[in-house]
C-alpha cells in the first residue's frame, strides 16, 4: 500500500474512492456503480458517484469536493473534503450506467500532447474483480468527444439533484 504524504494526494484518493469518506453514510466499493471526477488545476476538485443501497436497492448520488488552495498542505489527517449525498431515481441511475457502458472510444492511443494547466477528467466503473478506469485531459482527441460530452451531461444531471456546492464560485 502506498503512503500518501500530502493533503492533496489523500484528497484525490478519497475523491476517486468515495466510500472512504467517513462523514456520509457508509458505502462499499461493491455497491458503487460509477465514479466520475474532475480535477482542474486552479479550482476545487470534485467527484460524483452512484451507489446502489445494500438493503433497499435504492440508488444514491454522492458528490465530494476538495479545494487544494485551502488548508495546510501537509495536513494529511484532515484533507478538507466536503460531501453531500441524496437519493437518485432508479431510472436515471440505470440510464447513466447504460450510456457509459454503451460508449465506444479508441482506448489504447498515445496522447498527441501533454498539458500542465487544465482539467483532468476520469471515470471508473466496476470494482476490485473487474473494472474500467479512463482518464483524459481537457485537450482530448476528437475521438473522445462523445465521452467528454457524456461526462459533462451526467455531471449536470447529478448536480441538479444535489445541494448547491459551497466550494464553487456562485454567480449572484
Regions found by a protein language model. Give the residues of each.
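Function-determining sites in protein domains
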Residues: 1-172
Amino acid at each position: 500500500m502506498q503512503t500518501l504524504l500530502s493533503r492533496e494526494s489523500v484528497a484525490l484518493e478519497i475523491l476517486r474512492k468515495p466510500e472512504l469518506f467517513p462523514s456520509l453514510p457508509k458505502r462499499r466499493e461493491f455497491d458503487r456503480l460509477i465514479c466520475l471526477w474532475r480535477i482542474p488545476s486552479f479550482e476545487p476538485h470534485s467527484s460524483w458517484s452512484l451507489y446502489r443501497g445494500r438493503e433497499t436497492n435504492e440508488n444514491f448520488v454522492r458528490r465530494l469536493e476538495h479545494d487544494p488552495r485551502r488548508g495546510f498542505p501537509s495536513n494529511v489527517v484532515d484533507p478538507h473534503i466536503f460531501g453531500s449525498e441524496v437519493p437518485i431515481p432508479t431510472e436515471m441511475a440505470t440510464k447513466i450506467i447504460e450510456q457509459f457502458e454503451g460508449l465506444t472510444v479508441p482506448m489504447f492511443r498515445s496522447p498527441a500532447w501533454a498539458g500542465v494547466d487544465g482539467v483532468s477528467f476520469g471515470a471508473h466503473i466496476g470494482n476490485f474483480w473487474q473494472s474500467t478506469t479512463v482518464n483524459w485531459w481537457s485537450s482530448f482527441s476528437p475521438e473522445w468527444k462523445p465521452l467528454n460530452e457524456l461526462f459533462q451531461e451526467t455531471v449536470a444531471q447529478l448536480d441538479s439533484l444535489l445541494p448547491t456546492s459551497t466550494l464553487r464560485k456562485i454567480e449572484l
